[in-house]
Amino acid sequence: SSSQPFYESEKAISEYLLFHYGSSQEQCPHPEGPSEALHYPERCVSQCLQKELLGDHPRALDLGCAVGRSTFELARHCHEVVGIDYSHGFIEHANKLRIEGSLPYRFAVEGNLTQDAVAKVPDEIDRDRVRFLQGDAMHLREDLGVFDVVLMANLIDRLDDPVACLSQLSGLLKSGGQLIITSPYTWLEAYTPSTHWLGGL
């Protein structure tokens, strides 16, 4: 229906599966395209995580994990990874990937044209290190424990009150832990009242 939240829609789920798991060719079939912009969820981990600072059996939290690619990538380096997203649809598909390892889907190419694809977690990643939970980043459950790493990718500009969310992290992030925030900072009143924007005013 038209009242369905975007992040629960089939369109969003398809787009995010492509964004997280699509091949370079599927994401950008044009050779002149910006190839260095592809595979963003992987790059959030490979380029931002300071692996040398991790201790034994590190734990990671992926807040706003969507369909889970960064969560799985964190499992390359962390013993336990928790992915949380507000979207029930995103978490449902992330859990299917955790259990099955792959998931067929269809994405829009142009107009009414679509293409079949398969989202696949890389074989070398231990999916048993990962669990996904539906939850609200603004009101996190109290039994999560503490983490060595907290990743917030493409989340902070979609929160009602970013500062309030960040203030929760003092109880979730170990002393000396890593907080990784990546964002285009596309502030929109539909998600964040302008009085709560962290910039752009």
Language-model-detected regions and their locations in the chain:
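Conserved class I S-adenosyl-L-methionine
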Residues: H57-A66, V82, I180-L201
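S-adenosyl-L-methionine
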Residues: K96-M138
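A short glycine-rich, Lys/Arg-flanked "PGG" loop and its adjoining helix->strand segment in the class I
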Residues: V163-S175
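Conserved alpha-helix/loop element of class I SAM-dependent methyltransferases that forms part
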Residues: P34-H57
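Conserved SAM/SAH-binding beta-strand->alpha-helix loop
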Residues: S87
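A short SAM/SAH-binding and catalytic strip from SAM-dependent methyltransferases
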Residues: V149-D161
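A short acidic, Gly/Pro-enriched loop at the edge of an enzyme's catalytic core
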Residues: G135-V150
